[in-house]
Regions:
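N-terminal, positively charged nucleic-acid-binding surface of large information/translation enzymes
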Residues: 63-73, 77-78, 128, 134, ...
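Ordered, soluble secondary-structure elements with a strong preference for glycine-centered loop motifs
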Residues: 32, 98, 149-154, 192-198, ...
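Conserved nucleotide-binding/hydrolysis micro-motifs of P-loop NTPases
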Residues: 32, 48, 94-95, 118-121, ...
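P-loop NTPase switch module centered on the Walker A-proximal segment
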Residues: 2-115, 119-121, 159, 227-230
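Conserved C-terminal guanine-recognition region of P-loop GTPase G domains, centered on the G4
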Residues: 105, 111-173
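Conserved catalytic-core segments of large NTP-driven translation/proteostasis enzymes
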Residues: 165-299
Length: 300
């Protein structure tokens, strides 16, 4: 019998093949085109039907962010491309949210550094990039807005290399691929002078260069790194499964920072799919999930 969720819907089977998962964090200064890029990545993943309009500010849907134009509470979206699931993890763009930066980056296995072809790397992204390099994430550099007048993509690429070198990047991290393009005009390429007609070059490079998460066997374990909220089910715990496999309806132990432990039950298990979530039967090590039914949890 196929399990159902709390609404009675049948659950999807979630295969435990981490080779088909890529967890990637996006690091970008405000106005360097992060939201537009994610829009186009979602489109390339065929997540929008022809009759759907792509709304702006997919990631920036927090009221405070709309006012300030920065991303504070990290969001997760996911695309499927060439039989691979790419979990896109948004990062806070300011060091003011340092605690969240580290938690969010620990869900990723690589990062996209998005840089404006005219402005180059900005001081606000230095903190997040430094944290990403320190925990060993492999970077892909995307130099965006190369269609801007008077931009200088080659100089920006050199500035990014110098920044990473000064942040003590390893030799492997310094061997990063650089991708040029215009998210607004929906193209990415290995040469800024040679536009293409889509952004699949970027998606192919993510699959090729960013390592798949490792599947670690054992008792299931997850660090809650962020929360979502639904008026229907309340607080939702979000995190990357570190070890083992969680199943829908499973009894678990919630460990708090003070060392106390409480028995809980997973009422619904979800993975991210497009801009939303999909109820699943199980989630294995390496994937990012959202758990419903966990009461009194703490982030981190």
């Amino acid at each position: 019998m196929q399990p159902t969720n709390i609404s009675g819907e049948k659950l999807a089977y979630q295969p435990h093949n981490t080779m088909n998962i890529r967890n990637i964090a996006i690091i970008a200064h405000v106005d360097h085109g992060k939201t537009t890029l994610v829009d186009k990545m979602l489109l390339a993943g065929k997540l929008f039907r022809d009759n759907q309009n792509t709304g702006e500010l997919i990631l920036d849907n927090n009221d405070l962010e709309r006012e300030r134009g920065i991303t504070i509470t990290s969001k997760n979206v996911s695309i499927e491309y060439k039989d691979c699931k790419i979990n896109i993890i948004d990062t806070p763009g300011h060091s003011d949210f340092g605690g969240e930066v580290e938690r969010v980056l620990n869900m990723a296995d690589g990062c996209l550094l998005l840089v404006d072809a005219f402005e180059g790397p900005m001081p606000q992204t230095r903190f997040v990039l430094q944290k990403a390099l320190q925990i060993g994430l492999l970077p892909i550099v995307v130099i965006n807005k190369v269609d801007k007048p008077n931009c200088h993509p080659d100089e920006v690429q050199n500035a990014v290399f110098e920044l990473m070198f000064n942040l003590d990047a390893t030799e492997e991290q310094l061997n990063f691929p650089t991708i040029y393009g215009s998210a607004k005009n929906n193209w990415m390429s290995d040469d800024w002078k040679t536009p293409t007609d889509n952004i699949t070059y970027l998606l192919d490079k993510i699959i090729e260069y960013i390592p798949a998460p490792k599947f670690i066997e054992g008792a299931p374990q997850m660090l809650i790194t962020s929360l979502d909220y639904s008026s229907y089910v309340g607080r939702i715990a979000v995190g990357k499964v570190h070890r083992g496999t969680f199943t829908d309806g499973q009894d678990i132990m919630l460990c708090k920072r003070d060392g106390s432990m409480t028995k809980q039950k997973i009422k619904q298990l979800n993975t991210f799919s497009g801009l939303g979530k999909t109820p699943v039967q199980s989630v294995g090590s390496g994937d990012i999930c959202a758990m419903i039914g966990i009461e009194g949890f703490e982030i981190g």
